[in-house]
Amino acid sequence: LNQLARERILRHVVCESPGLVGAQSLSAAQPPSKRRNLKEIVPCVASGISQTGQKIVVIFSVGIDPDVVAFGADAREQINSNAELIFACPTRDIVPAVTRLAEMLNKSARFVGVDVLGAQAQPQV
């Protein structure tokens, strides 16, 4: 049971403390595709305002998932195509191959490591 909807728990924690991803405010947003059932692992989405006043779309994912980049690009296009795209996931799940995919988008995106238990976030460089 503790493995279900971990990405939603991550979104909840970050929406309560948006500074973890460099945001002033965040709220849950509709994903570009919905989960078909409770066991299906699908990233979830929030939108808001960054600490610099820019509109942002944040994608929450747990585990290494190359498909998260396409999911995020679709979500940004659906919510606000001009928004900055941020992927929030546990630091251990940020891998070079996936960050390169995010950098290759027409409007690049970045990853932020969010380690919920330690309530720390570090931008991936």
Question: What is each stretch, according to the model?
Answer:
Residues L1-V125:
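Charged, terminal alpha-helix-loop-beta segments
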